[in-house]
Amino acid sequence: MVKGKVTKPVKKATKSKQSAAMISKVKDDFVMTLDSDGEDLEEESADEKEEVEEKPVKLTKKQKKQKLSEADEELLEREKQAAKAGINPDFQFSLDGFAATSEGLDGWNFEVSKDDNKVQKREVDLDSIIKRKGGLLDEDEDEDEAETDVKMEENEDDLAIDGFGGGVQPGKDMDEPEDEDEENKEEVENEEEEDSDGSDSEAEECMHPDDLVLDDHKGPAIDEGPQDTAEEMAAFYAPEEENNDKTESVHKTFQTLNLSRPVMKGISALGYQAPTPIQSRTIPIALMGKDLVAGAVTGSGKTAAYIIPVLERLLYKSSKVAATKVVVLTPTRELSIQVADVGKKLAQYVSGVRFGLAVGGLNLRVQEQELKTRPEVVIATPGRFIDHVRNSPSFNVDDVEILVIDEADRMLEEGFQQELTEILTLLPKKRQTLLFSATMNSSISSLIQLSLSRPVRVMINPPKQAASGLVQEFVRIRKRDHLKPALLASILKKMDKEQRTIIFVARKETAHRLRIMLGLLGVRIGELHGALSQEQRLQSITAFKKLEVPILVCTDLASRGLDIPKIECVVNYDMPQTHAVYLHRVGRTARAGREGRSITLVGEAAADRAIVREAIKSVSESKQGKAVGRNVDWPEVEKLYSKIEEKGDIVNEILAEEKEEKAMLQAEMEVRKGENLLKYEKEIASRPRRTWFQNAQEKKADETSDKRNLLASNKDKMKKKKDNEEVRMYKKTKTDRKEASKRGKPKGKGKRK
């Protein structure tokens, strides 16, 4: 008994020593204040007592109620502190008072981060070659007086362009200059009725005499094949009665769309006040999970119309397993990069949503590493997407729930048919499909291959219509095709250097030659076409967006989807093939309610005049925008032409020097490639061989057929389509042949001889 009494205090003493050692360790880790030392000692002594007498404490009902009331008081105290800090716990998101577009948003980001391209390819510096040959010297600075005279005359020569970057004073009434222009137009018409080059009159009154012959047949550019019948549309599309509540309701604010708060904050960050008509109609339908075929004019907010419902639906996904839920397909790399930037800005407050990019021309390995993480949204071009699905480890599309096809009519063209068919076989059949385009005029027969399930058809604006703020100017070239480069230089010299201008040409060789020629004349200009590397293309767009280069000459690569802010003018150096392509080109300006103008150089081909006639008809029917003729000072153009002819040899020298430098860079790259093959032979040999759904011969055959179809007339295309749609002739089976032999008839076709 005595031993037991002696041992108990010893255990208590050792326990207290251990607790004291722990307390001293805590004191060493934390710096105590003078006021807190005493409090800590009292708490430590209390803790020691609790350790000695460790007994479970049961709370009575009264104590439980008292504890709950203390929690409520603590919650009220927190709310009071939040109110003092200026935070309202009952806050409801409101977008009232925001501008339609944020002034702080300077367009979308096209710059490629350094991590995406660790190995920077050396490119030929064309500007340095042009400078060595005496170009890019800003000849316009020596001709300031001449330019001021030209600008004074521009108000007389160009009809109805005041207010579109043509010298309107801030605060001046926009209606007054238009009335003055109408009066000036009538005066010029009366004075110059017999002018062979045309006068400053409405383009409808400046038609060529041969146009009257073409009124009966609109020409190949307008012939778009048979239209879908009412029965076919009723059988394919969802009935309108099912969606009247969703499609006909007008949402004046985003609040009425019942979007979540993180999505609303992203919308606010971009400065949107109210949904556009296409957004108001399509967002509710997309949130219902229905398939959608939507069309609206360029610059109407179609990208946000499908990004917003996608983000809203991704908020309710399971966050336990990473999986790709959404795939967005676009026809061009630049459009994919722009869509990714729009999505990231809208999703900046949405947690757990990542965007992946899979486009050609950029670092393949970096994209593979990004897709290994299985981002929720993948934005891609068709070819690179198929490449990653087949060859990138840990990336699959088994969980894809939404497929978005931007610029769907372009994707349904023959150039993308093989890739699109392959992608549809890779994706799950149970999915939602959203189609968006500015000219959604594809027939039902082409939409059937997408496996749409009773899609809802939403067409906001009438087809074949340009933006309401666009002034379309037309210049008749007649038999002066050789003066087109000089005419273009004359037009550009009258432009303000602080305004962005896009020039569309038919061929990349023409774009490159125009850049050199205009550079020799002292015009700062960039180029954008398929012959450039992806880095060069993105650099051109970024320089154009930052106004480092105010003029961009490009092919139809840039005619779809690109939203570069404040493009004042579009010049059609070469006429497009169809009116739909024309609408996509001129849609680069006058976007999102802004104003702009287009200048089109019209040749004598029947297809060219048919497109002009269709544009004028659209303006007269919609009573929006203007279509006018533009006067040209041809003597001045001829002077510029002689100047350009003198520099023809220099242009050829620059092209030859550029070709030599490219050959040198290519040789250096081949040497480095050979060195790497020798140095990393085992690593390269151990990599799995990449596969493709087409071999090189099949791909080349498809490209050849695409070129033939592009050059073929619409009549030949319709004949080929009709032949393909014909019912296949019945073919005899083995059973039929046996029965025929029993009846005494010989095998095969034909009568017995």
From Swiss-Prot:
Coiled coil: 649-729
Pfam families, sorted: DEAD, Helicase_C
Gene expressing this chain: DRS1
Biased composition (Basic residues): 1-15, 743-753
Region (Disordered): 1-20, 34-74, 129-205, 691-753
Catalytic activity from the UniProt record: ATP + H2O = ADP + phosphate + H(+)
Domain annotation Helicase ATP-binding: ranges: 283-458
Cell compartments where the protein resides: Nucleus, Nucleolus
Source organism of this protein record: Yarrowia lipolytica (strain CLIB 122 / E 150) (Yeast)
Regions of compositional bias (Basic and acidic residues) in chain numbering: 697-709
Quaternary structure and interacting proteins, as annotated: Associates with pre-ribosomal particles.
Motif (Q motif): 252-280
Domain Helicase C-terminal: 487-636
Protein name as annotated: ATP-dependent RNA helicase DRS1
GO BP term (any one): rRNA processing
This protein's UniProt keywords: ATP-binding, Coiled coil, Helicase, Hydrolase, Nucleotide-binding, Nucleus, Ribosome biogenesis, RNA-binding
Biased segments, Acidic residues type: 36-51, 137-147, 175-204
Similarity comment text for this entry: Belongs to the DEAD box helicase family. DDX27/DRS1 subfamily.
InterPro entries (alphabetical): DEAD/DEAH_box_helicase_dom, DEAD_box_RNA_helicase, Helicase_ATP-bd, Helicase_C-like, P-loop_NTPase, RNA-helicase_DEAD-box_CS, RNA_helicase_DEAD_Q_motif
GO molecular function: ATP binding; ATP hydrolysis activity; RNA binding; RNA helicase activity
UniProt key word ATP-binding: yes
Domain observations: The Q motif is unique to and characteristic of the DEAD box family of RNA helicases and controls ATP binding and hydrolysis.
PANTHER family assigned to the protein according to its UniProt record, in alphabetical order: ATP-DEPENDENT RNA HELICASE DBPA (PTHR47959:SF1), ATP-DEPENDENT RNA HELICASE RHLE-RELATED (PTHR47959)
The protein's Enzyme Commission number: 3.6.4.13
Motif (DEAD box): 406-409
